[in-house]
């Protein structure tokens, strides 16, 4: 990988907080499990998003349609070699200090996170792009096997790059998310949302860049009712090319989550640092360390968690 062009990374990772508190009944246990599933999906999606960092080559890449889940953007100089189709995959092994994301510490565990999917971002006209994305995520826990689950995302939308404002990108997209048990024969959660957002890249040199962004996820429909939320998030990402093959990433996200059918209100933070060793433009080895904090007006759903792990990633563009 070379540094012939500046590159910018925005980390779209957010840690969603989860669902309203209730007495300790079987139904409440279901709420707790669903809450943690949704939060883990977005937390690990944000962390592993740093893994999709191989240099895509010359050409402008708008905010990737996979970005809402994978957390990457590439911004280079436009030319005719822009590749609109991306295939991506990641397999990572993590240790988490609080697997169930419970108040008071919780139990640690190892888990495997697997992600694979495809994104198509065709240029429609000028600086207007379309996008269609499919993403499958699988989470498998070593000891707490009852926490294992699958996540499927399907969505699409439009992206517009305002060159006159320093390549400020604005976008709108629809997303459908479905969580199931590991055998995919029972639904845990689903939600349909519209995401509106913008992001502004800053290039300091060929080796250093940053991005600021804002996302608003607006609920259209979802189930179970207690798990449905809107989300408003501020994001900041930084990338440094340490060598020709080694890159460092930092990101921070602050999210406000008002739940639709309950009085629950959460403030969520995630801070993550990662390293990527790019073996080739298509394949990389990654490691990360992250801390997440959730502050809720329902004390039961306040928690903190530390995650560390490593994995391998592939990103192919056509």
Question: Each predicted region: which residue ranges?
Answer:
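Transmembrane beta-strands of outer-membrane beta-barrel pores
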Residues: 91-99, 122, 134-140, 174-180, ...
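Transmembrane beta-strands of outer-membrane beta-barrel proteins
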Residues: 85-89, 128-132, 168-172, 194, ...
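Outer-membrane beta-barrel architecture
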Residues: 74-75, 115-119, 155-159, 195-199, ...
């Amino acid at each position: 990988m070379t540094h012939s062009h500046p590159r910018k990374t925005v980390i779209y990772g957010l840690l969603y907080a989860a669902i309203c508190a209730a007495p300790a009944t079987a139904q409440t246990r279901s709420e707790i499990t669903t809450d943690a599933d949704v939060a883990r999906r977005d937390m690990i999606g944000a962390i592993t998003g740093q893994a999709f960092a191989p240099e895509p080559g010359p050409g402008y890449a708008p905010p990737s349609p996979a970005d809402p889940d994978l957390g990457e953007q590439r911004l280079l100089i436009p030319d005719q070699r822009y590749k609109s189709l991306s295939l991506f995959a990641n397999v990572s092994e993590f240790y988490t200090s609080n697997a169930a994301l419970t108040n008071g510490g919780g139990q640690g565990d190892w888990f495997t996170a697997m992600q694979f999917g495809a994104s198509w971002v065709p240029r429609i006209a000028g600086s207007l792009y379309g996008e269609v994305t499919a993403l499958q995520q699988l989470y498998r826990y070593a000891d707490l096997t009852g926490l294992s689950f699958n996540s499927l995302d399907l969505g699409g939308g439009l992206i517009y790059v305002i060159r006159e404002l320093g390549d400020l990108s604005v976008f709108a997209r629809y997303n459908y998310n479905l969580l199931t048990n590991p055998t995919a024969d029972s639904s845990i959660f689903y939600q349909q949302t519209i995401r509106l957002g913008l992001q502004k890249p800053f290039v300091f040199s060929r080796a250093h860049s940053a991005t600021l962004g804002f996302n608003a996820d607006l609920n259209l429909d979802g189930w179970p009712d207690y798990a449905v939320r809107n989300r408003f998030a501020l994001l900041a990402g930084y990338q440094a090319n340490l060598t020709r093959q080694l890159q460092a990433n930092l990101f921070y996200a602050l999210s406000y989550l008002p739940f639709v059918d309950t009085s629950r209100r959460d403030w969520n933070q995630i801070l993550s640092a990662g390293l990527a060793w790019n073996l080739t433009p298509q394949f990389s080895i990654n490691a990360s360390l992250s801390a997440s904090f959730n502050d809720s007006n329902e004390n039961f759903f306040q928690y903190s968690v530390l995650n560390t792990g490593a994995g391998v990633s592939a990103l192919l563009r056509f």
